[in-house]
Regions:
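Non-catalytic DNA-recognition/assembly elements of restriction-modification systems
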Residues: 31-181
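Basic, amphipathic alpha-helical recognition segments used for DNA target recognition
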Residues: 1-28, 36-51
């Protein structure tokens, strides 16, 4: 958490004014945190990791991708998208608030109240926000993946469909010649 805070960036500007952030310069950052503050920073860091993992795992590029976030049985796409949009915004706000609290704790700990603010600019929050164009492209990619046998709308996760599969009912809707009609 410290190395991702504004305090570390501020201190590293003095210890290593170039981009050479090796272990020697990083190891010179003094760390003296009370147990109470350490516990709070740990809690916030774990929340941030969980939020980032959930965000990352909602996309096909993740090894832990299960199912597209816009595919839910029995719901209108517009309703699903509204829920997705709210989930993204909630994650974004929580992550930003947590990062700012971590910054605030370290700024206070190092006595840098007059030098730094805890605010985190939006461009530095790496959590995905809902974007209709990107989300529809992602949904189309997932649907093509279902048609080609990479995914199944019946099962979560990666499904490698081939002529060697014993139970082809597991991949309903699979296109036999991999040419989408």
């Amino acid at each position: 958490a410290l190395l991702n805070s504004k305090v570390a960036s501020y201190v590293m500007d003095f210890l290593s004014p170039t981009l050479d952030y090796n272990q020697g310069a990083m190891g010179k950052i003094p760390v003296d945190v009370s147990e109470k503050i350490f516990d709070r920073i740990t809690e916030l860091s774990k929340q941030n990791i969980s939020i980032a993992k959930k965000d990352w795992d909602s996309f096909e590029t993740s090894w832990n991708f299960k199912r597209h976030y816009l595919v839910k049985e029995g719901h209108q796409l517009s309703e699903i998208y509204s829920v997705w949009q709210q989930e993204c915004e909630d994650r974004y706000i929580t992550l930003k608030k947590n990062e700012e609290e971590i910054n605030s704790l370290f700024i206070e700990l190092y006595g840098l109240e007059g030098e730094l603010t805890s605010e985190v600019e939006e461009k530095y929050i790496s959590i995905t926000r809902a974007d209709k164009q990107r989300d529809i492209k992602s949904l189309i990619s997932y649907i093509v993946g279902c048609i080609m046998g990479r995914y199944s709308y019946q099962k979560d996760g990666l499904v490698i469909a081939s002529k060697f599969m014993v139970d082809m009912s597991d991949v309903a809707g699979l296109d036999n010649d991999n040419i989408i009609p």
